[in-house]
Amino acid sequence: MMDSAKKSDALIMAEALRLVNEGVSVTFPVNGCSMLPFIVGGRDSVILEKPVDLCVGDVVLALTIPDNVLHLENVEKHYVIHRIVAFSGENVVLMGDGNLVQREYCKRTDVYAKVIGVVRPNGKKSLQGTFAERCAAKIWYILLPFRRYLLWIYKKVKK
């Protein structure tokens, strides 16, 4: 049985997705550290819109399964806000910017929203998909072998 907090979260997510599907932009708070350093959980919010065209490098909200359970049947799916790193036909491969190894998988139809911006605590908006943002994300992905050390430094500096 679902506890009341999870039930409340599920209702909020369902309403946000309904609005996005109707073409309304929704600002949604994020949790966790899987998108460091670009999106900080517990601090930033993301602006979600209905996904039209999906490209490698887009940050999306999707219902996914992690790569360590791909071979299992009836695996519980989870919503994540992660970056698209590859396509394989109708399948989408996602990875959090703060993740070292973990990838998630879903179908294109399981991508429910695209992040078009990040709202910082001071109200400043950082648009996603700009040339500068895409370059920074690409460089960050290339630095994957060093990400563990870069994230350690980032967390020490941000304390």
Specify the residue positions occupied by each region the protein language model found.
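Plant-biased intrinsically disordered, low-complexity terminal regulatory segments
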Residues: 2-3
